């Protein structure tokens, strides 16, 4: 791979730090893969999501889709460990890609061969983040449009949404579905009652995205959608929208974890290949949050 000569141990270094983070934070893996996803969907996988406001940069973190995004401290720890071994060599964009494999695999999911050699951008794109990031309130047509913009298809949409087999969501992103006088017909009534109870302590309360095996990377995300127990609209619509090709794909992954794992790895590679900066474009940031 790209770092064979310059930083041969990079994957192990990253994996070790992710493993350490998981000891005290069960959501560490979900945080990291979400950063990679939100990075790739805006100007390609260029580390732009990590930049904070600074001279010449208006951060993407002000976009609604990035409002609750976390995990920067873990990225900083990974970057520090990698810099110690190979200073000035590995980009922050590549760190997110490598960390995503470790995050999934350490939770019981698949491995895939990450292509490396991305460079870090010297700019952010706030408007791109506002327009391009999928929202938890969207229907299949809206979601497909956003995936299509970055050349990802329906299989990619359904496979990558499967990353919601771990991690959590705040109640504010689905509580409009819990209205007692106007119940959402695609939400299991018993499960809706559990969610109402969980969310009674406030809209900022966190709830597991996968109520069955919340920290395990498995196919239960899809079987949950079959039983109408996906808390987010943007997940449930993949199975509950009649006539959409996404329904068949959900059923396929629900029936075969091997099929899901294989497709997930391929879709992660596809996503990781969105418009990377290479060669002498961009830079290798020494601090992932700041331009050099």
UniProtKB/Swiss-Prot annotation:
Which catalytic residues are annotated?
38 (proton acceptor)
Disulfide bridges in this chain: 7-86, 40-45, 92-288, 171-199
Annotated catalysed reactions:
2 a phenolic donor + H2O2 = 2 a phenolic radical donor + 2 H2O
Q: Enzyme group, top EC level? A: oxidoreductase
Describe the task this protein carries out: Removal of H(2)O(2), oxidation of toxic reductants, biosynthesis and degradation of lignin, suberization, auxin catabolism, response to environmental stresses such as wounding, pathogen attack and oxidative stress. These functions might be dependent on each isozyme/isoform in each plant tissue.
Q: Which residues are glycosylated?
A: 68, 139, 179
Give me the residues that bind Ca(2+) 1, please.
Answer: 39, 42, 44, 46, 48
Please give the Pfam families that the UniProt record associates with this protein.
Answer: peroxidase
Family annotation (InterPro entries) = Haem_peroxidase, Haem_peroxidase_sf, Peroxidase_pln, Peroxidases_AS, Peroxidases_heam-ligand_BS, Secretory_peroxidase
Instruction: Identify the residues that bind substrate.
Output: 134
Which annotated residues bind heme b?
164
**MF (Gene Ontology):** heme binding; lactoperoxidase activity; metal ion binding
Q: Which UniProt keywords apply?
A: Calcium, Disulfide bond, Glycoprotein, Heme, Hydrogen peroxide, Iron, Metal-binding, Oxidoreductase, Peroxidase
Protein name listed in UniProt = Peroxidase 2
Family membership, please give it.
Answer: Belongs to the peroxidase family. Classical plant (class III) peroxidase subfamily.
**Might you give the EC number(s) for this enzyme?**
1.11.1.7
List required co-factors: Ca(2+); heme b
* Residues binding Ca(2+) 2: 165, 210, 213, 218
Query: Gene3D superfamilies of this UniProt entry?
Result: 1.10.520.10, Peroxidase, domain 2
Q: Which domain of life is it from?
A: Eukaryota
Cofactor remark: Binds 2 calcium ions per subunit.
- Metal-binding among the record's keywords? yes
**Which biological process annotations from GO are given for this protein?**
hydrogen peroxide catabolic process; response to oxidative stress
The protein's site described by Transition state stabilizer is found at 34
């Amino acid at each position: 791979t790209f770092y064979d000569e310059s930083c041969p141990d990079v994957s192990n270094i990253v994996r070790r730090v992710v493993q350490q983070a998981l000891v005290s934070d069960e959501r560490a893996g979900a945080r990291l893969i979400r950063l990679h996803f939100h990075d790739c969907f805006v100007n390609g996988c260029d580390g732009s999501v990590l930049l904070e406001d600074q001279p010449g940069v208006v951060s993407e973190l002000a976009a609604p889709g990035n409002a609750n995004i976390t995990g920067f401290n873990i990225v900083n720890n990974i970057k520090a460990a990698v810099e110690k071994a190979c200073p000035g060599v590995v980009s922050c964009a590549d760190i997110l890609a490598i960390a995503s494999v470790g995050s999934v695999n350490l939770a019981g999911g698949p491995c895939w061969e990450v292509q490396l050699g991305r460079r870090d951008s010297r700019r952010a794109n706030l408007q791109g983040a506002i327009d391009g990031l999928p929202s938890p309130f969207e229907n299949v047509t809206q979601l497909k449009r956003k995936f299509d913009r970055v050349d990802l298809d329906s299989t990619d949409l359904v496979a990558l949404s499967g990353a919601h087999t771990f991690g959590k969501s705040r109640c504010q992103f689905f509580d409009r579905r819990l209205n007692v006088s106007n119940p959402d017909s695609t939400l299991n009534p018993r499960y809706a009652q559990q969610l109402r109870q969980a969310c009674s302590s406030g809209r900022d309360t966190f709830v597991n995205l996968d109520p069955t095996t919340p920290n395990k990377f498995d196919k239960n995300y899809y079987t949950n959608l079959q039983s109408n127990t996906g808390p987010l609209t943007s997940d449930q619509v993949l199975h509950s929208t009649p006539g959409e090709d996404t329904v068949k794909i959900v059923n396929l992954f629900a029936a075969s974890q091997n099929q899901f794992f294989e497709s997930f790895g391929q879709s992660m590679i596809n996503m990781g290949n969105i418009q990377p900066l290479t060669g002498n474009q961009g830079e290798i940031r020494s601090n992932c949050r700041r331009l050099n």
